[in-house]
Amino acid sequence: MKENVPSTVVFILLLFLNISLLNGQSPPGKPEIFKCRSPEKETFTCWWKPGADGGLPTNYTLTYHKEGETFTHECPDYKTGGPNSCYFNKKHTSIWTIYIITVNATNQMGSSSSDPRYVDVTYIVEPDPPVNLTLELKKPEDQKPYLWIKWLPPTLVDVRSGWLTLQYEIRLQPEKTAEWETHFAGQQTQFKILSLYPGQKYLVQVRCKPDHGFWSEWSPESSIQIPNDFSMKDTTMWIFVAILSAVVCLIMIWAVALKGYSMVACILPPVPGPKIKGFDTHLLEKGKSEELLSALGCQDFPPTSDCEDLLVEFLEVDDSEDQQLMPAHSKEHPSQGRKPTHLDPDSDSGRGSCDSPSLLSEKCDEPRANPPKFHTPEGIEKPGDPETNLPRPQDPQSTSVESKLLYFHADGSKSSTWPLPQPPILHDPGSSYHNLADVGQLVLGTAGATAALLEKTDRHAFNPPKTTETGGEGRATEQKESESFHSKTDQGTVWLLPQDKGPFVSPKPMEYVEIHKVSKDGALALLPKQQENGDRPEKAGAPETSKEYAQVSRVMDNHILVLVQDPRARNVAPFEEPTKETPPSRPQNPAAKDLASFTTAPGHCRHPLGGLDYLDPAGFMHSFQ
């Protein structure tokens, strides 16, 4: 029994030893490549961390291959870079080429590999720290004192050829503080530090970085002691300026707080109110421009209307006392052939020229209908006898009978008449205007007129004078007959005016009549048109002025004027025509005899000019076409 005990203990001890040996041995762990660095972009080195060795000796190898290749290479140098590193010299380094690197670990129990690492030499550049760092305190006379720092690039980097470009950064701190003050210096190898505290010791370091890569390590520290007598005059001056500015700002704020309203009113004065008399600010605020303009006395825009809306149904009058007579008829055509020796100045003021004949013709082309008749009013004054009649020579070659001319009276203002377009059958294109005597030739009686009046009118209108009496005696006889004629007519009698020849058949141009003025009593003053008398001389004894007048007895419904003789026409010295040989009377135009009335369209042939209407006797003949 005692002999079996030692063998059992040895077995148990061997069993526990075998178990412990079996638990300590295993395959190696997975290694890790943690850094690859190139100090000058010509060579590079990679470092790795080994994994667990498994209790057995482990062997590490680094293999690589370039991108696009299948052949695998092993690390060319395991010693230059230190333990667990691989150094690639210039022969094995290529830029713009990607390296695929792997680390393998192997022992008796097995092997393991690291994750592949892709390396481009251009982007793994990490240069060495700058060298020869020096510090110097300078005190120039014209500038404030400063700390001058200088250094040199790393020895392995070729910066002269431009193969690698470095940027620098400086940091410094007082010895008794923990914070660093950093300054970027760029590509220069010197730098100035201005803000320094006297009596302090400063520690300075510098580092560098390429265009593509990483910052280098900080260079070894360099220190400098700032003396206590270090001048700070510039800083003291700026401090004084800052304090003074703060005091001035406080004073201004205090003044604005006390007298803010008055200062604002002084800097930004208020807009003065309107000082226009009668100006209402409330209307301006409400936006009522019409009431505002009316309050200021301004006129609004004139209303727009058609041409006929502006017609005015009255004539312009004045208080002139001049009386003029109509000229006697010529041998060729009524109102032609004799030039008046003297005429008053025309007061038409140019209104007639504003209406073109073409414009009037457009308005007068519409046909007239239902022509009204002229009626003589009751109580017509009898004309008086003329004072004197001056004879004038008669043209022996005359082919027409001298027209009988009535004497009219008026003391109103003068107004010009515009012509209306004439029918092409009745007159020559050269004829344009007619006097009042021609209008009288158109106003003929109808079948409703009394027989006695018709016979009397026909006698005066168509029968030539049988004797060669002087113009004065014939005129007196005419006036006497007219006086008896007016005394016999009543209000319902149709007026018949004499006519010597067919209406407007003369080839020569005709004249127009100017209405001089119309008085309050309805009297109408007429002015003849002054014309040249080239084919008939005047008698030496003719007066200088030739005037005839008519009196408006009444105005009918359609604005038709009824003209009567003026009893006061005898007091004016008229001019008389001499007796002349009268050719045998020729038959009157049947169309002129049958026409007994005419029509006028009120406001149809008028055009407003300054508030006046123009009366054109030529418009009376439009219905005789």
Curated annotation (Swiss-Prot):
Location of the protein in the cell: Membrane
Protein's name in the database: Prolactin receptor
Subunit and interaction comment: Interacts with SMARCA1. Interacts with NEK3 and VAV2 and this interaction is prolactin-dependent.
GO cellular component, one term: receptor complex
UniProt binding sites for Zn(2+): 211-212
Transmembrane stretches, start-end: 238-258
Domain Fibronectin type-III: 27-128, 129-229
Positions of disulphide bridges: 36-46, 75-86
GN (gene name): PRLR
Stretches in topological domain Cytoplasmic: 259-625
Sequence similarity: Belongs to the type I cytokine receptor family. Type 1 subfamily.
Region (Disordered): 325-423, 455-492, 524-548, 571-601
Keywords recorded for this protein, A-Z: Disulfide bond, Glycoprotein, Membrane, Metal-binding, Receptor, Repeat, Signal, Transmembrane, Transmembrane helix, Zinc
GO molecular function, one term: cytokine binding
UniProt remark on domains: The WSXWS motif appears to be necessary for proper protein folding and thereby efficient intracellular transport and cell-surface receptor binding. The box 1 motif is required for JAK interaction and/or activation.
Residues with attached carbohydrate: 59, 104, 132
All ranges on the Extracellular side of the membrane: 25-237
Function: This is a receptor for the anterior pituitary hormone prolactin.
Signal sequence interval, chain numbering: 1-24
Pfam families linked: EpoR_lig-bind, fn3
Residues spanned by motif WSXWS motif: 215-219
Motif Box 1 motif, residue numbers: 267-275
Record field: compositional bias (Basic and acidic residues): 329-349, 375-385, 475-489, 532-547
Topology of the protein relative to the lipid bilayer: Single-pass type I membrane protein
